[in-house]
Amino acid sequence: MRIFKSHRLLKLVNSYIIDSPQPTNLSYLWNFGSLLALCLGIQIVTGVTLAMHYSPSITDALYSIEHIMRDVNNGWLIRYLHANTASAFFFLVYLHMGRGIYYGSYQGSRSLTWNIGVVIFIVMIVTAFLGYVLPFGQMSLWGATVITNLLSAIPWINQDLVEFIWGGFSVNNATLNRFFSLHYLLPFILAALVLMHLIALHDTVGSSNPLGISGNYDRLPFAPYFLFKDLVTIFLFMLGLSIFVLFMPNALGDCENYVMANPMQTPAAIVPEWYLLPFYAILRSIPDKTLGVVAMLGAILILMALPYLDKSNIRGMQFKPLSKIAFYIFIANFLVLMILGAKHVEDPFIIFGQISTTLYFSYFIIITPLFSIFDNILFDIATKKK
């Protein structure tokens, strides 16, 4: 083990993975980081392998996917692993962010770590959208057309910007080549951002803990205690992922994407992947195109404002009954938005979408600041009595 503490590169591995001191009371909710790192590794390895056989052409893209599935050794396994790990990646990210909001992991000196995490989330969304277009089935073509057309809401440069991204007057070969290049590049940028996320976490105050207090008084090294704990959830995760990949690989996909792209025929409903549905529902809930785009972007970017909106002296919601209720309502509302994102734009879904969008923004803009002020008042009263 001496080389781990003397070698220039291995010393970093030692400080982050082996000797890194962690609070002793960390629960399994702090295991998402290792699972997300595993997902990113799987995505990069399977993605690079798929890229060796993929053809970014509007005429050959779908055929190259079928070639991978039928002719490449274990190509079906690599493709389904890539597709289902993407869903698992977002599922774990949502759990990771939800845990961060519940336990106040964005407060104080951890705000930089939180904001880098939000940037990672944005890059993930862009990467997922680009990957969704690559098979170039019906949903790929029309999804690319609809989402890129949102840029026409930008004043002055609207349609010119859209055509610049397309490389023509509609989605074509140039578009697919650009999307493929960016989809290949962004995971490596994502890996760099993950390293920045880790550096920001470990070079400040380290991991938070379920009690929301300083963990400096009682810590244990990461290995072997938390390393073994991470391995438990990694094995369980691989078991769950294997069930999806081997027994129901298309459960989270869209059958329309197995149909050759046809610019003359619009699908009955144009919907993104399930993990982007809440933001798609926010976009569609506002009739005005420009305001809808602003609301959709605001729904993501408002997460960056959370460290400045929550000024409570008590970190987390463990001992705040009202905040707990508000948080669970927020989670339920987020799931409702996910359901509404897959529905047709018609009554009563339009009204429900507008109500859910209002509740989503109200949680951050109204409820969180008010509850933090209320908590601080109660905290001051309690301390003065003592």
Swiss-Prot record:
Main location class: mitochondrion
Organism expressing this protein natively: Trichophyton rubrum (Athlete's foot fungus)
Positions annotated to bind heme b b562: H82, H183
Keywords attached to this entry: Electron transport, Heme, Iron, Membrane, Metal-binding, Mitochondrion, Mitochondrion inner membrane, Respiratory chain, Transmembrane, Transmembrane helix, Transport, Ubiquinone
Membrane topology: Multi-pass membrane protein
Gene that produces this protein: COB
Compartment(s): Mitochondrion inner membrane
Name of the protein this chain belongs to: Cytochrome b
Transmembrane segments: 32-52, 76-98, 113-133, 179-199, 226-246, 290-310, 322-342, 349-369
InterPro entries hit by this protein: Cyt_b/b6_C (IPR005798), Cyt_b/b6_C_sf (IPR036150), Cyt_b/b6_N (IPR005797), Cytb/b6-like_sf (IPR027387), Cytochrome_b (IPR030689), Cytochrome_b_C_euk/bac (IPR048260), Cytochrome_b_N_euk/bac (IPR048259), Di-haem_cyt_TM (IPR016174)
Function comment: Component of the ubiquinol-cytochrome c reductase complex (complex III or cytochrome b-c1 complex) that is part of the mitochondrial respiratory chain. The b-c1 complex mediates electron transfer from ubiquinol to cytochrome c. Contributes to the generation of a proton gradient across the mitochondrial membrane that is then used for ATP synthesis.
Molecular function GO terms recorded: metal ion binding; ubiquinol-cytochrome-c reductase activity
Oligomeric form and interacting partners: Fungal cytochrome b-c1 complex contains 10 subunits; 3 respiratory subunits, 2 core proteins and 5 low-molecular weight proteins. Cytochrome b-c1 complex is a homodimer.
Pfam families named among the record's database cross-references: Cytochrom_B_C, Cytochrome_B
PANTHER family associated with the record: CYTOCHROME B
Similarity comment: Belongs to the cytochrome b family.
Cellular compartments per GO CC: mitochondrial inner membrane; respiratory chain complex III
